[in-house]
């Protein structure tokens, strides 16, 4: 009987221990959950407090009085600046103690207090996104070795563009001004753009490419504004090269006959270009390269020395130059032995560099068509016939179409 009682007491004690152990575990789990909820709520509170602070700062900024935007003309002493505010006029204003006067340069945009006209902030230059897209971020990978048959032109463009950027002290010692720009003219496909990209590569300059037709805008003053912002962007990213292709679209000769608002807007754009060419200094490492295949219609004011310092002609390549261009473009091709590139070049009398490159591409396509991994002499001959007779085949196809 006594043993039975002892057994019952032990069982009841074990049950009590298990009961309270379970209660303790449940309480610890509840405490853990409450702690996690508290931390989550604290994180939410911190986020909301940060949001409230940002909104208060934004409200404070909105409640502050606005500022005038002006353009610095020149500094006047240690703490005075002459600023132009449109449309009010010019003012001599004080500089805030927080701004270093060494950072203030002509033609930069600044913010002025609306009550005291004190200069309080230097603003970034305003550049149109369309103008920003004209700048090629990556330096062109073209080199002089990729240009064939233009040794004379390469030498002349080196003297005018590359030498002033790399060795400006030579011009200072001689006492002559640095050239500002050059004009490349010749038939299409003769290597004008390729040589401009090669110069930008060897001078390690920012390359800004713009077509003249992009500067012809619909509304009055838009083309002139884009020209101004183009040169502003070039100054900010100096040393830089501005390559203006198809310059004849805005630089044609002016005539007295009224051709409508479109022609007058093109003339305004050209006048702004002339103004910018006269306004910037060649020592600022900004060079202008223009290209055209219609030099006969360009305005004489654009071609005068001081704006365009050298005019370089790009004639159709000679037989030796054509052979060299073929060797350059076929350098990476898998050719069979015995291919006579010189004889192929002699057959392409009057062809441009672009057509010679097209012959190499077409020869590879003929080999690809026959599922070969090498290019033969016959492929080149077929490619020459196809490229040079492209116009004839087009006329024949049109005649067949209308029969």
Swiss-Prot record:
Pfam families in alphabetical order: AAA (PF00004), AAA_lid_3 (PF17862), Prot_ATP_ID_OB_C (PF16450)
Q: Alphabetically list the UniProt keywords.
A: ATP-binding, Cytoplasm, Nucleotide-binding, Nucleus, Proteasome
Q: Which PROSITE patterns match?
A: AAA
SUPFAM superfamilies xref list: P-loop containing nucleoside triphosphate hydrolases (SSF52540)
The places in or outside the cell where this protein is found are: Cytoplasm; Nucleus
Whether Nucleotide-binding counts among this entry's keywords is: yes
The UniProt record gives the binding positions of ATP as 186-193
Question: Recorded GO terms, molecular function?
Answer: ATP binding; ATP hydrolysis activity; proteasome-activating activity
Q: For this chain's UniProt record, which GO biological process terms are given?
A: proteasome-mediated ubiquitin-dependent protein catabolic process
Cellular component terms, GO, for this chain's entry?
cytosol; nuclear envelope; nucleus; proteasome regulatory particle, base subcomplex
What is the protein's known function? Answer: The 26S proteasome is involved in the ATP-dependent degradation of ubiquitinated proteins. The regulatory (or ATPase) complex confers ATP dependency and substrate specificity to the 26S complex.
**So what family is this one in?**
Belongs to the AAA ATPase family.
Question: What name does the UniProt record give this protein?
Answer: 26S proteasome regulatory subunit 8 homolog
Organism of provenance: Schizosaccharomyces pombe (strain 972 / ATCC 24843)
Quote the gene name from the UniProt entry: let1
